[in-house]
Each structure stands twice: as C-alpha cells, then as structure tokens.
UniProtKB/Swiss-Prot annotation:
Lineage of origin: Bacteria, Bacillati, Bacillota, Bacilli, Lactobacillales
Keyword Transmembrane: yes
Protein name per the record: Cell division protein DivIB
Purpose of the protein: Cell division protein that may be involved in stabilizing or promoting the assembly of the division complex.
Subcellular location field: Cell membrane
Broad class of where this protein is predominantly found: membrane
Cytoplasmic side: 1-46
Keyword Zinc belongs to the record: no
Signal peptide start and end residues: none
Keywords: Cell cycle, Cell division, Cell membrane, Membrane, Transmembrane, Transmembrane helix
Amino acid sequence: MARKRITRRDPEEELSKFLRHEPGQGQETRKLSSQLTSLKKERRRGLLTRLGSIMAVCLLAIAFLTYYVSPLADVSTVRVLGADDLDGKSMVEVAQIKASDKVVDALRGQKKISKKLAAKYPEVASVTLSVKGLNTLNMQVHERKVSGYIKDGSSYREILANGELGTKSLAWREFDHDKPLFISYSKQVALKTNLKIFNSFPEYFKKQVKMLSGNTRRKTQMILVMKDGNVIIGNTETIKSKVKYYNSIKQDLTTNSVIDMEVGAFTRPLTSAEKKAYGLS
C-alpha cells in the first residue's frame, strides 16, 4: 500500500493569515457601522410617523363619532336667508328638515334639498346649507332674477328670467315699478316669446320700457309701452335690431306717438282710445 505524501506547514504562518491587519479595513468597518445606525434611526423615525398618523386619524374618528351620537349634532334651528317673499316655515317643511335630523346628514343632502325647493318654488334657483355654531343650520336661498310682472286678476305675479311665474300674489304697491308690466297675455307661449325678446334688448333700452301688451293683432306683433308715453309696435323677428333707433326717433316727436317698426319705421300721434287702452291718459 502506497504511503500518502504529507506536506509540512508552519503553524505561525497559518495563524498570521488571521491576525494580519490589512490597511483601510477598520475604516470600512466603521463606515458600515455608521450606515447601519443611520438606517435604524430612519426606520424608527418612519415608524413613529406612521404610528402618529394612525393615532391622529383614530382620535379624529372617535371625536366625530362622539359628536355624531350626541345631542349637539342634532339640528336645533333652521334659519332661511335670502327669500323674504317666501314663507320660511313652509320651505323648511318642504325641505323635510326636522329637529331630530343630524346636521351632517342635512349637509350631505344639500343637493337633494335644493332640488325639492326649486321644484316647489319657481323663484328658487338653488339652496346652499351651512352651519353656524354647533347645530344651527343656515339655508341660503338663491332666487331667480325677476324680469317683470304680470297682471293676474286683481293682483300681480313675478315673471322670472326663465319665463316661469312666481307663486306669490302681489298688490300694486308691492312690486318693483322700475320693471315692466306684462298685460293681456292669455297664452304662456306668447309670454315666454316676448320675455325672451325683451331680455335680449340692450340694458339702457329695457330701463325705458314701462309695459308690454299681449293684445296684438298678429302672433308676430309685439307692443311696448314706454315710460315717456310713446308706444312701439314691432315684429318679433326684427324688433331686436330696430330698438337702437328709438332714442333718435323720439327726439323729433312733439307729442306722445305710436312708432311702428314692423315694416320700416313711421310715426303717428296716439289716439284717445289708444292712450286709454295703454294707461297713458
């Protein structure tokens, strides 16, 4: 049997491999240790931040739930603002807001409440809800613009910018006489047509109109009674482009006259019957 070859090794030389110190090895060790320390601090900071955020959310949720189940969250008072001509109590009933309702729930249902009130009251364009204090609910009503008034029996009603009529009946002294009065309109279609044309007039001209009469000979005819006592007769298709000549035409008039703008433009004095019919006598 062949003998194995044995190689002799110096023990000191073998041990020196483990004890030998290479230059720069300590610096790398310290650098690695420093990085580990910084990483631990960063992780600890991130963990504390996340825990703080979770605790804050939990505290807010607890506070909200505590408020929500308490009587402080119940509607105590509803104040109706911006609708002086409408009955505030009736509006609250239509909105179906009760003292037992939660303020938060009412605010969340604002769009639904606004639609209910607009459907019931033509004057209402929209409603905005807000809270004053802890549980006082403010209902801010945004009303539609009033373009004029129409005679309804012995009283008057508002004509809104969209052509709808207001719900409340007004006495002669209660409406704004700076806005025109629409008389003798038996058909809603004719009223809306003339209102649309009137709203398209220049602002300076609209301020001069006292009354619009629906007592016309033709569907395409439009009659305007002016505040200065003159009467304009025009065609619904062309009158918008012709009213700009009114101020220059009236300067040549010596008496209250009819200014016919249906075909061209000519003038004649008002008859006694016409003055009486238009309330100018």
